[in-house]
Amino acid sequence: MDVVGENEALQQFFEAQGANGTLENPALDTSLLEEFLGNDFDLGALQRQLPDTPPYSASDSCSPPQVKGACYPTLRPTAGRTPAPFLHPTAAPAMPPMHPLQSTSGMGDSCQIHGGFHSCHSNASHLATPLDQSVSSHLGIGCSYPQQPLCHSPGASLPPTKKRKCTQALEDSGECRVWACHCRPMTSRSRSSEVQDPDSEGQNRMPTDQCSPALKWQPCHSVPWHSLLNSHYEKLPDVGYRVVTDKGFNFSPADEAFVCQKKNHFQITIHIQVWGSPKFVETEMGLKPIEMFYLKVFGTKVEATNQIIAIEQSQADRSKKIFNPVKIDLLADQVTKVTLGRLHFSETTANNMRKKGKPNPDQRYFMLVVGLYAANQDQFYLLSAHISERIIVRASNPGQFENDSDALWQRGQVPESIVCHGRVGINTDAPDEALVVCGNMKVMGTIMHPSDSRAKQNIQEVDTNEQLKRIAQMRIVEYDYKPEFASAMGINTAHQTGMIAQEVQEILPRAVREVGDVTCGNGETLENFLMVDKDQIFMENVGAVKQLCKLTNNLEERIEELEIWNRKLARLKRLSSWKSSASEASTISKSSRAVSASSPRRAVHKKNNKVYFSGKRQACPNWVFQTLVITLIAVMAFCALTIVALYILSLKDQDRRVPNLPPSNITSSQEPALLPTASSSAPNTSLVTTPASLQVPEITFCEILPCQETYCCPIRGMKEVSSSPVQRQSEEKEFHQRRWSEDKSKSVLARNALSGPDWESDWIDTTISSIQIMEIQQIIDHQYCIQSLQCGSGNYNYNIPVNKHTPTNVKFSLEINTTEPLIVFQCKFTLGNICFHSKRGTKGLESHREISQEMTQGYQHIWSLPVAPFSDSMFHFRVAAPDLADCSTDPYFAGIFFTDYFFYFYRRCA
């Protein structure tokens, strides 16, 4: 018979059983429904009683195979027999039927969702508790609902949906990892239990993140699910199970629940993943072979979970019939997708009417349950089940339930938040972006932009020089908006400063966008209105500023270099002026000497002087002129006597210093001499050795080389290579003292000129901070100084002994460090006796002598010295300021423009 009523099959059944009008009776015994949902009913008996469900589509090629008899039939009364599907179980689905419930008045305390979905028996200490408050806070059943892992992220639910065309991301993602707990590779297959009708929008599905809220599903573990085993009796992982709502449910912000229209059908999709090849199901009676898998769909009431709401399905002729369980095939390691369409609730929820325009506080809700079963010998065993959040089922959709103006505005998941799924326009009715504001906007905080490198690709550094050129081409103008445009756009301040979009488009096209036509207040239409992206221009400014910083740094470096050169030029100018004044003084002194030493025959010069002073003699008497001449002659005589006295004193001082020469002239076998003549020049003092010289540490390589053989000791038949360095040094000293006694006035004038305040500011320290032998890290310090000669005031002499076990092929590297960038000149070097006499060694010596550096500059100066092949050697280095002195500079500028260093190396054979 055809079902035409709203309660349809169930109502007919209760009328047939004499229970008319008791559908809503709380005392109704629901054992028959419980038996149908949870017990292992007899499929054969149902097949003999129930007709097949006709296909609901004109094309039944995609219709799922239906279970004959295992459905909600249009039942007819039978005499003395309770239909098998409605036997009541009190245990698990695999257990035999037990006694039915005695009463339903206490369903709030002891309830059970049959078919193996919920088992919520309360006790004295454990009352029924609601589900997770974040999902469905009004469900009155105490069941555990752990989050099912989703395709996107485990535990995350898809956003709610309101549009019918919105589906889940699994529809387009190719069944990506639906169940992340199992990582076995799998393929995907899909089947559909419906053919889309003309108004179906299954072909226009959108990604989930662009949709409205979607109905949430959660697994229910109130009754233990049965496990699957393979042919080897190995337990398989839990079945991956996921239910997705395709369409038919709209979220109502006012009711804070999803609403389904009874006359409109809804559609759901189930994704099932089995791991391995299931052959057996584990029951309380042991292992049972699996014959087939089935899907069941039914509804339940939130306030009375024992009451089952039948689900109907529209047929091809627009009629409705009870939905039959769907027979499905599950392949190993594959995702099976089953789509159930054209479904309807057979009833509506109670208390749907509003009170004073507000939701009814006594509103009742349904929940939708989808279960997966394994069948064996007409018995069903629950494998997995999902239950939805609360649903309101209404008979129609009058205007009192939904306000069109609030259709897009919803409450967000975060407290005190409102969400709008669509475009928002302020002072405009045609927003073309997510938010369009015509008018001023105040932002007290900051505007954030996505900038994470993980969300970017093709990252390339821009040319800041090009950005600077583009910014230089942009024109900044002042302008006034037209009144009709300002009024239409909500602009209060018409006069502004900015850029012209057309000009910016020629320079930086990506910073200009067309936003369509804009209508002004007077009706004028501006076609293809241009707007400027100031963020792009701001980034161009950042690049231009970086380029300007580079240019500024380069200019600062060049300015610093120019300042250094200017200081050097000023220093040279002062030096040249001082030299010119000194030369003038020397010419005056020479001319005065020539006048005093000239004979009477050279009277012509006196006439010239008379002519020169002719103008003054007319004004001055003769005695004044004679007095001046006598005074000048007396001064010159005094200067000459002073010079002679200083010269004599210097000779005496030199005689005192000659006996105190360093022990380098000793001709004994203990310490070598530079020349035989040097020892004969002072036979009485050659053996004199100061105690300090004996305590000076030797230059030895015994720590890095074996010290077994003695080199260059004793010296026999040494070849004279050059004059003694000490003798030559004493000769230079005598020459310098002679020059100093003759030109004392010049040196005094020079030091006075250099002691001025201008020169003191540019003073350069030309002394050496440290000296060492690099190979052995031997420091040459003040203990090597020859105090008898000079060790300070611009002249330093070092007497350095070398160990007798030092090989002749050892390299001596002298490291000189200065505190300022200076130039070190090697003015002279003198080599003593050679430590070998073969021609081969002599050739090597000659080639070694040819290699000589002339100067180094900087802070660190390294000189390679030929010390080892000789019994003694002397080196003269001059440390000078740049561009102020060299080897030819007057020695009296020592300590001012340069500092001289003399190093005397000799082998100590004692």
Swiss-Prot record:
Domain of life: Eukaryota
Compartment list: Membrane
DNA-binding region residue numbers: 142-405
Keyword entries, A-Z: Coiled coil, DNA-binding, Membrane, Transmembrane, Transmembrane helix
Similarity comment: family membership: Belongs to the MRF family.
Residue ranges that the Swiss-Prot or TrEMBL entry lists as coiled coil: 543-575
A single GO molecular function term of this UniProt record: sequence-specific DNA binding
Species, as recorded: Homo sapiens
BP term (GO), one: positive regulation of DNA-templated transcription
Domain Peptidase S74: start-end pairs: 451-559
Transmembrane portions of the chain: 628-648
Keyword ATP-binding: no
Entry protein name: Myelin regulatory factor-like protein
Record field: compositional bias (Polar residues): 663-682
Segment forming the signal sequence: none
Region of interest (Disordered), residue spans: 189-208, 661-682
Topology with respect to the bilayer: Single-pass membrane protein
Principal place of residence: membrane
GO cellular component terms given for this protein: endoplasmic reticulum membrane; nucleus
